[in-house]
Curated annotation (Swiss-Prot):
Quaternary state and interactors: Homodimer. Homodimerization may be required to stabilize the binding of ScpA to the Smc head domains. Component of a cohesin-like complex composed of ScpA, ScpB and the Smc homodimer, in which ScpA and ScpB bind to the head domain of Smc. The presence of the three proteins is required for the association of the complex with DNA.
Family: Belongs to the ScpB family.
Gene name for this UniProt entry: scpB
Gene3D superfamilies: Winged helix-like DNA-binding domain superfamily/Winged helix DNA-binding domain (1.10.10.10)
Keyword Amino-acid biosynthesis part of the UniProt annotation: no
Coarse class of the protein's main subcellular location: cytoplasm
Cysteines engaged in disulfide bonds, as pairs: none
Protein name, UniProt field: Segregation and condensation protein B
Subcellular location(s) per record: Cytoplasm
GO BP, one annotated term: cell division
Length: 190
């Protein structure tokens, strides 16, 4: 295998290792070459990435190498972050997410009782966006899945913990409980 192919493979390894990065020893095992040679290749690649024609750089932190964007392009990355995405959540998904956030762990049936409508699609969307996940199973008939929020939920909404959620006013909480009660009452009377 020539140097160009080694660099190409290392580039891919850096990419798939993501923010965690990769140790030179791991690269050496994958490529079946000596660790010193890996270091030499990484240093060459770092120099190649230093040019103005490259958007990425290879950085080393605590013996781990990873890709990073260049600081001089930060204003462009910020513009991308500021552009609203087409993948924003629907009103139904936001309502379901709020219910999960405040009432977790919670089953799909409990969510549907609160909302008064099916939540299947909203749940699928929230799981696919990694905002909620299965937290286990409830005791009882059928052992339904319990849902809760994820670390990504906290990151997305700029929260450190669930305690940072805005408090529900007592009026809203009583209204939700009243809605739940009347919704259940209507089901029984049918």
């Amino acid at each position: 295998m020539d140097r160009t192919e080694q660099k190409s493979i290392i580039e891919g390894l850096l990419f798939v290792s993501g923010d965690e990065g990769i140790y030179p020893e791991q690269i050496a095992k994958v490529l079946e070459i000596e660790g010193n040679e890996v270091i030499d290749i990484l240093e060459e690649m770092q120099k190649e990435c230093e040019g103005a024609h490259r958007g990425l750089q290879i950085v080393q932190y605590a013996k781990v190498y990873r890709f990073a964007t260049k600081k001089e392009h930060a204003s462009y990355y910020q513009k991308l972050i500021d552009i609203p995405t087409a993948a924003s959540l629907s009103q139904a998904a936001l309502e379901t997410l709020a219910i999960v956030a405040y009432r977790q762990p919670i089953t799909r049936t409990e969510m549907e009782e609160i909302r008064g409508v099916k939540t299947d699609k909203a749940l699928q969307t929230l799981v696919s966006h990694l905002l909620i996940k299965e937290m286990g199973r409830a005791e009882g008939p059928g052992r339904p899945i319990l849902y809760g929020t994820t670390k990504e939920f906290l990151d997305t909404f700029g929260l450190k913990t669930l305690d940072d959620l805005p408090p529900l006013s007592e009026e809203n909480e009583q209204m939700n409980e009243a809605d739940l009660f009347f919704g259940s009452l209507q089901e029984i009377s049918k």
